[in-house]
């Protein structure tokens, strides 16, 4: 390459001064610049070549002849490396030629302005989609691609606002079906989903809360389901039923509350005890506290472990033992019935005397069973 440049140096004598003199004398018409208003003609005007383009114009042809199997991109890479390898002295003639072409271009096209071609932008795959449209499309089909913004806005204008029912379909139906399938469970609302505005967090606890019966016999019939209830089964339809309680110590579960004492449960049968589970509870109705007092959480074991906290003197201090002896000696009420009531925790009503004075009432049976249990508990 250096030998070629040395043999054919670029000199100013190659600029054809005779031709320039003819053009300056006006013997031949000069090049008429194209009108600026013609956009089609202006779009065809090429930029003046720089020094690299002047050098690569002939060098590319030479490399293409030597390497016919190479792609044009590969040839461009080779030309770039070769141009960087040249020294400043070797690049000088090409730089001068590029400057001459630039000045000539300015004379030919004085109103020329470089306007780069706009690259054809492909359609963007990921467009910004309305968030509400994405939420509403979840209920239709999760496999379909999101539509354009215009369609999403059109649907939003047609529907007005995005209702939570359309965004989260079937939440209430899922809750109802779950509650119907598992009546012993209250927390059937699906986790991980936001609560709809029209649905309060406490509304999930109100339905199906009348699953406890007013009679204690249904509670005794299903003892293995009740301890697993997670929520507070208080019922708004709280009605006292004083003569259905057959459990001798059923009312003692409320003995820990400050409003209801232990002895009051023995002296009189309270209303039917509302069962509350062994998990933490949240009272929903404040009017129940007026009847039951402020309830404390129940003990861990459903047995009689709470009796360990009370001494025998506190339990029997206010009782008349002669009254219990009178009831124990009553005919028709054998000791076997008391023993069975002590072991099972139930005293059948049929074993008590059906007729007689007030000592045959349910209060007497409860007091009799309580005293018998305390005596056997102290002996053991």
Curated annotation (Swiss-Prot):
Subcellular location: Nucleus; Cytoplasm
SUPFAM superfamilies xref list: HMG-box
Tissues where the protein occurs: Predominantly expressed in ovary, lung and heart. In the ovary, restricted to oocytes (at protein level). Present both in mesenchymal and epithelial cells in some adult tissues, including ear.
Pfam families per UniProt: HMG_box (PF00505), Sox17_18_mid (PF12067)
Coiled-coil intervals, chain numbering: none
UniProt region (Required for beta-catenin-binding), positions on chain: 323-328
InterPro entries per the UniProt record, alphabetical: HMG_box_dom (IPR009071), HMG_box_dom_sf (IPR036910), Sox7/17/18_central (IPR033392), Sox_C (IPR021934), SRY-related_HMG-box_TF-like (IPR050140)
A GO cellular component annotation in the UniProt record: nucleus
Span of domain Sox C-terminal: 260-380
GO molecular function annotations of the record: DNA-binding transcription factor activity; DNA-binding transcription factor activity, RNA polymerase II-specific; sequence-specific DNA binding; transcription cis-regulatory region binding
Region: Disordered, residue numbers: 24-43, 139-167
Induction behaviour: Up-regulated by VEGFA.
Keyword list, A-Z: Activator, Cytoplasm, DNA-binding, Nucleus, Transcription, Transcription regulation
PROSITE patterns: HMG_BOX_2, SOX_C
A GO BP entry: positive regulation of DNA-templated transcription
Residues of the DNA-binding region: 45-113
Subunit structure: Interacts with CTNNB1/beta-catenin; this interaction may lead to the proteasomal degradation of active CTNNB1 and thus inhibition of Wnt/beta-catenin-stimulated transcription.
Function: Binds to and activates the CDH5 promoter, hence plays a role in the transcriptional regulation of genes expressed in the hemogenic endothelium and blocks further differentiation into blood precursors. May be required for the survival of both hematopoietic and endothelial precursors during specification. May play a role in skeletal myogenesis and up-regulate the expression of muscle markers, such as PAX3/PAX7 and Meox1. Competes with GATA4 for binding and activation of the FGF3 promoter. Represses Wnt/beta-catenin-stimulated transcription.
Protein name: Transcription factor SOX-7
Organism: Mus musculus
